[in-house]
């Protein structure tokens, strides 16, 4: 299975740190954020990676190159301007799923998480079109995004049968079919596609209760940096 790291955001919430440096190259414990993902994906057996980029993307390519230094193969999907999540994935589909049928993993580049990527399902059983990893709600998203019911992701259901609403972690396995109708180079958000599939019972999920942070602000970057340094005994 191939994996995509989403790295095309402008990083506006992270300014001024991202005025001259793309967010994926901001450092956590002296290592670029994106390298943490790459090394953990490699350890889980993902060695063919696709990275999209837009803002200062040439710096990402210059730093990571073809991935050989990190023991992986990296190809890039350059966007002249950010295409949003679904648009970026749709543009990269030929690299992610050459046969147009095999699912692939997608990881948001601006999260830090101890989720074991080797736990991701390598296949999606029909009629499933997506598998989402959900996490406990952070302070900045107290209402959550979705809920879980018997292994399926749902929007709304009877409270007695549903685990409390959880937050989408930005970690998923997706089917190319989810992007039918999205043309290469078209801007498109992922949430509407997921909600449509959820309404048809086509999305499975799991709850990861470990460490997870949306590293979207300088404050959260500092928080994660301190956490990782403590974990590493630095």
Where are the regions a protein language model picked out?
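Short catalytic helix/loop segments, enriched in acidic residues and glycine
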Residues: 20-33
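Basic phosphate/pyrophosphate-binding loop/patch that engages nucleotide-derived ligands
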Residues: 42, 96-103, 114-149
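Conserved N-terminal catalytic core of the sugar/cofactor nucleotidyltransferase
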Residues: 2-5, 13, 31-108, 119, ...
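Catalytic-core segments of class I nucleotidyltransferases/pyrophosphorylases
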Residues: 46, 105, 112, 118-125, ...
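N-proximal low-complexity "stem/linker" segments adjacent to membrane-targeting elements
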Residues: 1-5, 10-18, 25
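Short beta->alpha linker loops
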Residues: 29, 55, 80, 210, ...
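Conserved beta-strand segments of alpha/beta enzyme cores
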Residues: 24, 73-75, 129, 202-204
């Amino acid at each position: 299975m191939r994996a995509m790291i989403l790295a095309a955001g402008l990083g506006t919430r992270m300014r001024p740190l991202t005025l001259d440096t793309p967010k994926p190259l901001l450092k956590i414990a002296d290592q670029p954020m994106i390298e943490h993902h790459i090394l953990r994906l490699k350890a889980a057996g993902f060695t063919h990676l696709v990275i999209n980029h837009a803002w200062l993307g040439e710096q990402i390519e210059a730093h990571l190159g073809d991935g050989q230094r990190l023991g992986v193969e990296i190809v890039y999907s350059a966007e002249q301007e950010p295409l949003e999540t679904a648009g970026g994935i749709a543009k990269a589909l030929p690299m992610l799923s050459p046969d147009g049928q095999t699912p692939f993993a997608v990881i948001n580049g601006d999260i830090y998480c101890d989720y074991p990527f080797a736990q991701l399902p390598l296949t999606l059983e029909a009629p499933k079109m997506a598998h989402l990893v959900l996490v406990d709600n952070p302070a900045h998203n107290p209402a959550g995004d979705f809920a879980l019911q018997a292994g399926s992701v749902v929007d709304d259901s009877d409270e007695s049968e549903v685990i409390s609403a959880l937050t989408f972690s930005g970690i998923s396995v997706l089917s190319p079919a989810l992007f039918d109708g999205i043309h290469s180079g078209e801007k498109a958000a992922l949430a509407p596609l997921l909600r449509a599939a959820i309404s048809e019972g086509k999305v499975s999920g799991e709850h990861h209760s470990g460490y997870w942070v949306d590293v979207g602000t300088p404050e959260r970057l500092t928080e994660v940096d301190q956490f990782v340094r403590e974990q590493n005994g630095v």
